[in-house]
Each structure stands twice: as C-alpha cells, then as structure tokens.
C-alpha cells in the first residue's frame, strides 16, 4: 500500500478530517486524565527541521513518546535537504529506516519532492506556503469550545501567508466563510483565492472582515526569513491589530486564535492573550493531540 502523506488539508477528505479531530479530542481527554497509550510502540518519527520551532518540536516529540514511540531531531546541519544530496535520495534512505517523516522547511516543493520518493508517510509541519498541522489544532479547538464550524464566518486579519493559505483550504474542507483583511500587496495567493472564490472574500478593512464573525485569527506581521522587511511590514500592518475593539465587531461568542509566537503590541494588543475570547492556550496544547491523532492515522492507517 502506498504511503499516505499530509502536505495540505486537501490530502484528506472532510470525513477523514472530522474523524481525526474527534479522535484528537479523545486523546486530549485521555492524556488529561492520566491514561497512557502505546499504539506507536517501537515506531520512529524522523523530524527534519530547516526552520526552527519550539511548539512543533515539543508537540511532535512529546506526541510520539506519549504514544509509545520515539522521535529523532534532525537539524539543518544534519540534513541540508537538496544541498549535496538530492532530496529524493535523502527521502529514499531516511524513509527506509523510520515509520514517518515530519518536515518543517521553506519551499513547499521540498516536502512535495520528498513525499514523492518516500516509502513512508510525510507530514508538512510548515512550509512558506502552508501550515496544515496548525489548522488541525485550530479546528479541533473550535469544535471543543463552540461545536461545528460549518456555516460560520472566520476573519483572518493580517498577512496573506502560509497560515492564511491553510485557512483558505480549511474553508472548503470544513464548510465555512473566510474573510481576509490585509493591506494591498500582502494578499494570499491569487490562484488559491480564485479556486475558493465562493468561500473567500478579501477586504482592506479589518472591521469589515470581523463584523459578525465567530472566529478571529492572526499571525505575526513578519515571518521567519522576512526579518529585513520588519519595518516596512510594521508600517503596512499598523491598522491590522486584533484588540478588544476589533473583537467587539465580531459575534458576541467569537473566539480569538493565534498560532504563536505572538508579538504583543503588533498583530495583537497586549491584553488579547488573556482576553475572555482567547482560545490561544487551548489551541496551543491541541497541536500535541491533533498531531498524535495524525500520526496514528498515517502510521497505522486507522484511528484506534
């Protein structure tokens, strides 16, 4: 049987995604009640990091351990995909020794090429184009706190980046409307917008995007690798901050989410992390449980 990969949300059907999120919620309850699992006993996850991340490493490594398996960390010094050895050669060799491979890198093409040659499941833990693992955590969090997101309105405030792209995919998979508020020149990928034009609206005013929304989401103004653009981005995004005033435009029961790390005083006001609408800490923990469910699904080809 050919390996299943998770490079974008489109690699799973809506039914598969919803089953996975239900299982993730079950895993969260088990873990919080002290139950243990060994469904991935003696299984090994290779974690290739060309972009560093606290949450990604901790959640995947802890997740494999909690399921009875293990994870190995490979830094840029250990791998250097495509520099010296072709990506495809690395994929063939690494996948012959482990049970799954997680990659966090820059170019989305890197994970696509790796997956094509890999005999084991490949997980996109973030590229410059997509961040599907975070969307699993976000959708799990919304379901746990508010129920089904079907028919809801979600407002993305800020840069049309990889997180925004994954929210566009999620709008189709989970059947919600997405309003994207961003300054000119920072829009999401135009082809992606056109493919989902029936669900996605791009506007300039954050207030317009947030009006009546059930979920407000944002990310940093300058992502990793864009540090030299920081000043220009601060100027462009100055009015694209999620704060209590913007939350007041949303539905009275609206949630606020952020994938972290958050820059207080920039994309969010200092008081938003602990605002009554904030689901950020719940969302952050769910990276662990959503990814455990994903690992079981891909490695075992089932959800126990």
UniProtKB/Swiss-Prot annotation:
GO terms for biological process, alphabetical: arginine biosynthetic process via ornithine; citrulline biosynthetic process; L-arginine biosynthetic process
Positions contributing to L-ornithine binding: 162, 219, 223-224
Keywords, sorted A to Z: Amino-acid biosynthesis, Arginine biosynthesis, Cytoplasm, Transferase
Places the protein is found: Cytoplasm
Pathway entry: Amino-acid biosynthesis; L-arginine biosynthesis; L-arginine from L-ornithine and carbamoyl phosphate: step 1/3
Pfam families, per database record: OTCace (PF00185), OTCace_N (PF02729)
EC number: 2.1.3.3
Chemical reaction(s) catalysed: carbamoyl phosphate + L-ornithine = L-citrulline + phosphate + H(+)
Binding residues for carbamoyl phosphate: 53-56, 80, 104, 131-134, 259-260, 287
Listed GO MF terms: amino acid binding; ornithine carbamoyltransferase activity
Enzyme's top EC category: transferase
Gene Ontology CC entries for this record: cytoplasm
Domain of life (superkingdom): Bacteria
Principal location class: cytoplasm
Physiological role: Reversibly catalyzes the transfer of the carbamoyl group from carbamoyl phosphate (CP) to the N(epsilon) atom of ornithine (ORN) to produce L-citrulline.
PANTHER family for this protein: ORNITHINE CARBAMOYLTRANSFERASE, MITOCHONDRIAL (PTHR45753), ORNITHINE TRANSCARBAMYLASE, MITOCHONDRIAL (PTHR45753:SF3)
Database matches in NCBIfam families: orni_carb_tr (TIGR00658), PRK00779.1 (NF001986)
Family: Belongs to the aspartate/ornithine carbamoyltransferase superfamily. OTCase family.
Listed name of the protein: Ornithine carbamoyltransferase
Biological source species: Marinobacter nauticus (strain ATCC 700491 / DSM 11845 / VT8) (Marinobacter aquaeolei)
